[in-house]
C-alpha cells in the first residue's frame, strides 16, 4: 500500500533524523503547549515525565528497529521463497518458518546495537526531571560534591548493563546460527 509506505518512510525519516533529546523535549514540553491535549484523556499520560520519556524512547527505537527489520528481510533471497512455494508450502508458513527466522538472525547484531544505544540514551531522561541513573548521580553530586567518583560509578553501572546486553545478544546469535 503506497500510503502506508509513505507514512512508514516519513515516520522513520523524522525519528531517525532528529536527536532523541529533541524528541523528548518536544513530547514533554511541546505537547503540553497544545491546549486541546490538556483537555483530553491523553493529558493524564502526557503530563508525566516518565510516560513522555517512554513514548519518546519507543517512537525513536521503533523507527530504528523498523529499518533494521526492513534491511533484514531484504537479505532473504527470492529463491528461498520460491523453493518453499514450489514445495506447496503456503505463504503464511513460508513467512513464519523461513523468512522470520532468517530476518531475526540477520537483524540480531544491529538490534543489539540499538538496544545498547537506547540503554545509554536513557541518560537523557534526566533532562525532563525523571530520576534515572544520571539523574540520581546528579542528585548525589549535589549532596556529596564528588562528581568524579559518582560519575565513575554511574559509568560503571552503564558499562555493566551494556556488558549484559552484549553477551545476551552474542548468546542469541550463537543459538540462532545455522
Predicted segment positions?
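Transmembrane alpha-helices and adjacent helix-loop boundaries
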Residues: 1-178
